[in-house]
Amino acid sequence: MVWIWATIGLLALVHILQAWWKNKKKRLPPGPRGFPIFGSLHLLGEFPNKDLHRLARKYGDIMYMRLGLMPTIVISSPEAAELFLKTHDLVFASRPPHEGSKHISFGQKNLIFSEYGAYWRDTRKMCTIELLSNHKINSFKSMRREEVSLCVESIRAAANNRGVAVDLSDKVSSLSVDMSCRMVLGKKYRDEEFDERGFKSVVREAIQLASAPNLGDYIRFIAPLDLQGFTKRMKSVNKAFDNLFEKIIEEHLQPNDGERTMDFVDVMVGFMGSEESEYRIERPHIKAIMLDMLVASMDTSATTIEWALSELMRHPKAMKKVQKELENVVGLDKMVEESDLEKLDYLNMVVKETFRLHPVAPLLIPHASIEDCTVNGYHIPKKSRVLINVWAIGRDPNAWTDAEKFIPERFEGSSVDVRGNHFQLIPFGSGRRRCPGIQLGLTVVQLVLAQLVHCFDWELPNNMLPEELDMTEEFGLTVPRAKHLLAIPSYRLRKSA
């Protein structure tokens, strides 16, 4: 065992000396000095986005640090984000190696974590045109209406028990899972149809493992040792998904009787075996994209809805303002339709403000530099990991007045949106690696939020005051509430609605 650690130490020393010699005459961005091998990993705690924000105040909005042996650039202002995601977009369009994606997502064949190249370009094109186009999103409109109505009816039944709180976090999460499964896989899956751990449990474990600080991501040559035991768990999760996806693909290869709605898997199966691109699309590629679509659609939307409801309950005036707008646009005789969403200006301001204060992925997904590059006079080494701290950007006092406060009205008359064109608000990223599912995500978030606020009045349990609502976060691949949101509903539409 001693010789293993001695070898690791020697290899690390050689790596550090090579990097130092290569970069010693080049001007790197300012940043903290790190320790041998581990770099500045010790500076990151439970909430890395907040720790990096604190360091950026000292070193600047373009900061260099080593995390393990990985050269890392941290971006903390809209101006710096524009340089990396627009001016030099192509250079930073790749992804660093990721142990979680390697073992869970079928060899990093998914869209989110795959390296920049022909496979990523063709896969993104397929997803954008075939899976996430406005036409495809609209084809699932009736499904969304049905699932949201079921959720409303469930809460309405609970509201009959006056004074009893509903677990809104659980309700929204279940709704998001059901919609995602029907859209991607063609039907809802009960836990017992998956394996003994249950569908939702395995999805949560996959997200947890993908976001866990894995030493193998930062000190690459120790990854095979699996010192933290993550690899074994990742392979177990992958096996569970593989078994399910194999069964689903086989079902979709059978002739459609005409009664089943075409879902995402039908589209992807149609590409299987195709050699029109530089590679042949096989089952592992389809399974990786299926997993991407599931996790990205179910977890991100639910987290944003949960935070938006939390902020509205903490700010009763904003809640009343949203409800008043819904009364004027929709009326109290019926539920919200998707066609109403574009008329709900204040609701859309609430959604933007929620994305600003509670970005689902506060550091986005890490970018990687394809080659050496000079940005703003700084040398950025090839294969650097680039972290865009959108959490810090959303709180930049140079970009936002009263940046820590929830003020939806700040967007009144403003052209700022969340689609990656305004770098002070980029919850979906920007440039080539911008999330291709923006329209789907916005539609789901706006529809579910509007419906829950329109159909019900909400009261915090145990006579809790709005300012007493716990807003603690739980950091991961996404950042949900640490504690579930509980609230007492009372139905507010006319009884015939």
Swiss-Prot record:
<keyword id="KW-1133">Transmembrane helix</keyword>
<keyword id="KW-0560">Oxidoreductase</keyword>
<keyword id="KW-0735">Signal-anchor</keyword>
<dbReference type="GO" id="GO:0004497">
    <property type="term" value="F:monooxygenase activity"/>
</dbReference>
<dbReference type="InterPro" id="IPR017972">
    <property type="entry name" value="Cyt_P450_CS"/>
</dbReference>
<keyword id="KW-0472">Membrane</keyword>
<keyword id="KW-0479">Metal-binding</keyword>
<feature type="transmembrane region" description="Helical; Signal-anchor for type II membrane protein">
    <location>
        <begin position="1"/>
        <end position="21"/>
    </location>
</feature>
<dbReference type="GO" id="GO:0020037">
    <property type="term" value="F:heme binding"/>
</dbReference>
<dbReference type="Pfam" id="PF00067">
    <property type="entry name" value="p450"/>
</dbReference>
<feature type="binding site" description="axial binding residue">
    <location>
        <position position="435"/>
    </location>
    <ligand>
        <name>heme</name>
    </ligand>
</feature>
<protein>
    <recommendedName>
        <fullName>Cytochrome P450 71AU50</fullName>
        <ecNumber>1.14.-.-</ecNumber>
    </recommendedName>
</protein>
<dbReference type="GO" id="GO:0005506">
    <property type="term" value="F:iron ion binding"/>
</dbReference>
<keyword id="KW-0812">Transmembrane</keyword>
<dbReference type="InterPro" id="IPR001128">
    <property type="entry name" value="Cyt_P450"/>
</dbReference>
<keyword id="KW-0503">Monooxygenase</keyword>
<keyword id="KW-0349">Heme</keyword>
<comment type="similarity">
    <text>Belongs to the cytochrome P450 family.</text>
</comment>
<dbReference type="GO" id="GO:0016020">
    <property type="term" value="C:membrane"/>
</dbReference>
<dbReference type="GO" id="GO:0016705">
    <property type="term" value="F:oxidoreductase activity, acting on paired donors, with incorporation or reduction of molecular oxygen"/>
</dbReference>
<dbReference type="InterPro" id="IPR036396">
    <property type="entry name" value="Cyt_P450_sf"/>
</dbReference>
<keyword id="KW-0408">Iron</keyword>
<dbReference type="InterPro" id="IPR002401">
    <property type="entry name" value="Cyt_P450_E_grp-I"/>
</dbReference>
